[in-house]
């Protein structure tokens, strides 16, 4: 993962001001992704699926229907898909009568990009990785960003920061216990 990508990881909303670079990097699609998008029934669902694909690629997290979508992004997606951009600010109106479609789009986007939810096995592996990362490092303040990078590189959807902080705290406690036991046995 490139260093410039780190600030986007775990965002829960689309930045209101997207640059041309961000639009092209996260919301421009491969031929395979275009095929997946074009398989949707209507224009709005095509735009919505494209939005979900780009958001996961940008943040490593799924987008809910209540977040604002900047007009510049709707325009960019419309241009990408040769569809007139909608005049809606959020996806809420699109999914209001069909909430299952939101979940379907989120799952389709994460599958297309190879992302999945964290399993218990992956959580334990993450704790073990964190304990190794803590060796010789007295300052755990950068761990949250490192965890987000690790999750993205392993194509694991970002849980809420609260859950990530609990995993970090568990790793720190385990590491401190290990250090205490090491000192006792010296």
PLM regions and their residue ranges:
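N-terminal-proximal low-complexity accessory segments that begin disordered
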Residues: 3-53
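Alpha-helical structural elements
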Residues: 21-24, 50, 69, 124, ...
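Conserved small/polar residues in nucleotide/adenosyl-binding loops
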Residues: 184-186
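Charged, low-complexity surface segments at secondary-structure and domain boundaries
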Residues: 31-39, 58-63, 90-95, 111, ...
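Linear-motif-rich, low-complexity cytosolic tails and juxtamembrane regions
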Residues: 2-18, 75-172
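A broad "ordered helical/assembly scaffold" signature
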Residues: 14-16, 47, 54-59, 65, ...
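Amphipathic alpha-helical packing elements
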Residues: 40-80
């Amino acid at each position: 993962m490139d260093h410039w990508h780190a600030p986007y990881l775990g965002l829960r909303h689309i930045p209101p001001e997207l640059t041309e670079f961000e639009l092209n990097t996260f919301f421009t699609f491969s031929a395979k992704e275009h095929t997946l998008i074009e398989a949707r029934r209507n224009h709005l669902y095509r735009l919505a699926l494209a939005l979900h694909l780009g958001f996961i690629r940008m943040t490593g997290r799924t987008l809910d229907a209540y977040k604002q979508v900047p007009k510049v992004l709707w325009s960019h997606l419309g241009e990408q898909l040769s569809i007139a951009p909608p005049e809606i600010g959020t996806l809420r109106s699109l999914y209001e009568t069909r909430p299952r479609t939101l979940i379907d789009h989120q799952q389709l986007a994460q599958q297309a990009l190879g992302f999945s939810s964290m399993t218990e096995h992956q959580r334990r592996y993450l704790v073990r990785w964190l304990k190794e990362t803590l060796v010789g490092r007295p300052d755990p303040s950068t761990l949250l960003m490192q965890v987000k990078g690790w999750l993205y590189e392993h194509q694991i959807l970002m849980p809420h920061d609260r859950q990530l902080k609990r995993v970090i705290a568990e790793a720190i406690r385990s590491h401190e216990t290990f250090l205490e036991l090491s000192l006792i046995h010296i």
